[in-house]
Amino acid sequence: MPKLKTRRAAAKRFRVTGSGKFMRRRAFHNHLLDHKSPKRKRYLGTMAVVDERDHDRVSHMLPYAG
């Protein structure tokens, strides 16, 4: 059977944890930051776990991740 291709766009956006979960960046942290509080901007700078309902979709895009 041939090797499966990784979707390169997904490979740049997701990271795998040791337990097999996927991490992602948070939205709303690119521009228009003047009116957002420092606390909110710190929070938006952290990584988030991909929801369990989206886990299968991400894992199909990244067949060799974990």
Swiss-Prot record:
One of its GO terms (biological process) is translation. Signal peptide: none annotated. The keyword Ribonucleoprotein applies. GO terms for molecular function: structural constituent of ribosome. The keyword Cell cycle does not apply. Gene3D superfamilies: 4.10.410.60. PROSITE patterns: RIBOSOMAL_L35. One of its GO terms (cellular component) is cytosolic large ribosomal subunit. This is Large ribosomal subunit protein bL35. It comes from Synechococcus sp. (strain RCC307).
